[in-house]
Amino acid sequence: MNAVLRVRISAKQSKQKVIITAASRVTHTDKFNICGREAKKDATTVLDCSVISAIAKKYAAKRIETDNKADAWWPQLHSFAVGLKGAPDLIKAREVAHHIGTVHHEINYTVQEGLDAVRDVIYFIETYDITTVRASTPMYLLARVIKSMGIKMVLSGEGADEVFGGYLYFHKAPTPQAFHEETVRKLSKLHLYDCLRANKSLAAWGVEGRVPFLDKEFLDVAMRINPAVKMCPGKEIEKKVVREAFADILPQSVAWRQKEQFSDGVGYSWIDTLKAVTAAAVSDEQMAHAAERFPIHTPQNKEEYYYRTIFEEHFPSESAARSVPSVPSVACSTAEALAWDASFQGKNDPSGRAVAGVHEEAYKD
């Protein structure tokens, strides 16, 4: 194992080194592998991506050929953020870009543009999972812009929430052991959800996404951290380990900002409109007979029914339907974590706003 990864991770400097080692390995490799095009930063969940951006910016400033001694006049690090106008993630991504000095690109999409893309998105991501469809659509639209600029690769902050328990429902974890076991479950299912979204939404336009937080050596260290240190009981901020390690190189408004899931952070009206449109498109009678039409993983609400209908048009086989996970979830939890809090019982809402008493409304549409 790299010597850097053997240090004690309780110290702030050591935490930084572990993450920087993972990110630098990716960014250094990229400068040789992307045929002269710049490495770019895709701003999804702002805190996680901001950490990777700051590290990438550090290494992009020097020439590898001179062992990082000479300044690099080219390429410049570009950053990207996508969302509806006024979305909370756009505002914070803009702050980070200004703070670390990237060439920033802010891509606005309209709700109608998102709705028009849903059918194609479901085809490319090959799932009808509600959260994945919601979040993949803006990422798909973002990837189109990135590709149009001739860019081949982006870095992303995927995996940090799974490793450090960043989702808001983790506030309800009853014990360190339960917290750790849930992070393991989340990591084991990433290929069905967030990594599927990031990979296939980008690959639909020929863009490669790389994820330093899922670097194997980094995971080997991060998953050995005492889960009691990662926990965020009550109103304590989530992912405190990461925030403390990088608070000095990020804007404070970002370093200590509450988690917003990507599908929320791009604009709350995106999810609310999807719910309204699908509720109007699927009748009560159709829902009443959902089990007859879809005996495998029967849709539990109209939004899921709508996506499932499109999915079946693209992939009509039973094996395709079975390949998609279908379990109840609150704020992207696993089914096992629903036992953590009485308010979770009977709920099936993947939005972070579903965690009562924890989520603080970031803005109003």
Give residue spans per PLM region.
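ATP-dependent adenylate-handling active sites, centered on carboxylate activation for C-N bond formation
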Residues: 1-6, 10-11, 18-26, 30-250, ...
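Conserved S-adenosyl-L-methionine
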Residues: 254-259
